């Protein structure tokens, strides 16, 4: 876009100096002076036909009065001294505007043309940009922040769950199906085919097993969690597929190996096993404090890798077992005074729990479910009138 027109009429004039100005000068000298003046006059007229624009010289063609130029914007004749040349057409300074926002482009550095229409930079990128938002299908400018998922690009405000319209930010888990974005909860329910509008994540976790679902972490890559083991349902024993060494933040997606149970079949309870270093850490702290608070549980969770819920259950059962041991010792002293004796309590967990009775720990992701099942010990016969106690296998 250039200012290239100047309607300055070039007129040449012949200088006829008065004779008295050259009185006393020979004819040859007078002729030489007149030729020099004509040469300088022509040089000045040529310089008047150029203007300096953006560091470069642009020649301004003179318009003949017989064929005046027409403005491509309004269609009228251009009688101004300066005019604009864009897309090989002449424009009045006031007529070169964006066809969308009507922004005057006479002072702009660039303008864009498409199908005979003039656009400013913003409207051109908005309408004809190569990158388009996969949600609103509008153009994305080169300076705008975007969210990427697989091969799709989204505005920050358009990167939302298709079901609940929740805005997803960096670090949130989401899933994609048929080029549609879903949050973690609705993507899982969509895969399972059990979507209900009022279903929340707590109810979903209470259902038990699910399918292996891929979740994305906002960087376009799929990250897998720690695989979980399972035993055959035909064996008739509890499934030890819950790894207590993982917390909720270890995996970027929820990986479950167990298929959903039929509606008529009850979900089997989960079972927890502890590693040696986890037991050592919990036993060491239990010797100092039997009832840790929330701050202590948080520190223990960081050291052991267990969740607070698992630690709460372990300390609850440890306190119950400690009270039973103290009670048995007191009852043992009374029996000795009467001439009877009881076998001393053993630290082995096998003496407290019959081998034929299995102690299970239910799904810890749902606090509403009973955590520890009741187990009757062979020592309960010595405690007349006492209700069945709860315990956890391999506590110490």
Swiss-Prot record:
Annotated spans, Disordered: 248-272, 328-365, 377-396
Biased composition (Low complexity): 352-365
Molecular functions per Gene Ontology: DNA-binding transcription factor activity, RNA polymerase II-specific; metal ion binding; RNA polymerase II transcription regulatory region sequence-specific DNA binding
CDD domains, per the entry: homeodomain, LIM1_Lhx2, LIM2_Lhx2_Lhx9
UniProt-listed PANTHER family: LIM/HOMEOBOX PROTEIN LHX, LIM_HOMEOBOX PROTEIN LHX9
Gene Ontology CC terms: nucleus
Residue ranges flagged as DNA-binding region: 267-326
InterPro entries in UniProt: HD (IPR001356), Homeobox_CS (IPR017970), Homeodomain-like_sf (IPR009057), LIM_Homeobox_TF (IPR050453), Znf_LIM (IPR001781)
Places the protein is found: Nucleus
Function text: May be involved in gonadal development.
Protein name: LIM/homeobox protein Lhx9
Lineage: Eukaryota, Metazoa, Chordata, Craniata, Vertebrata
